Amino acid sequence: MLAGVVARPSECVELVEEEDAGLLSGELEVDLIPQGTLATRIQMAAMGIPAFFTPAGYGTEIAAGKEVREFNGKMHLMEMALYADYAIVKAWKGDTDGNLIYKETARNFNPLMAMAGKITIAEVEELVPVGELDPNYIHTPGIYVHRIFKGEQYEKRVEQRTVRKRTQS
């Protein structure tokens, strides 16, 4: 499984500690990747670049087993592009040719994942006929989308806000 965020930090600890959660049983493989490195790995795959060097993660457990090189006096790790057999993306609006428009933070990873996937499946909130989308606002051209469908039910999930208690002055 590849995901930018799979759970809140407290839930991540539970996932690691529970024997039947998959990690300890060997059913689930986890690769911890810094967020910027993850984005760049996807971007490189989308652009057809097989690998790149980054200083992120050098000197940590993330560096284990990776090629290391020095550039301008700074150590860098070689990271491989991250291709996907299937990319599942969600867009706000799309047309029947697969052209997609995303809203807000959905623009962060969805366009790159759509380009990095061998087969991209897009779910849209609104599916319109070809020609109804303004080409100036399309984030993912239909050439990258292999399947498109209109979603039916959406549950708005909000992260639980956690703050520290106010101290008395």
Regions found by a protein language model. Give the residues of each.
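Conserved alpha/beta enzyme-core scaffold
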Residues: 1-169
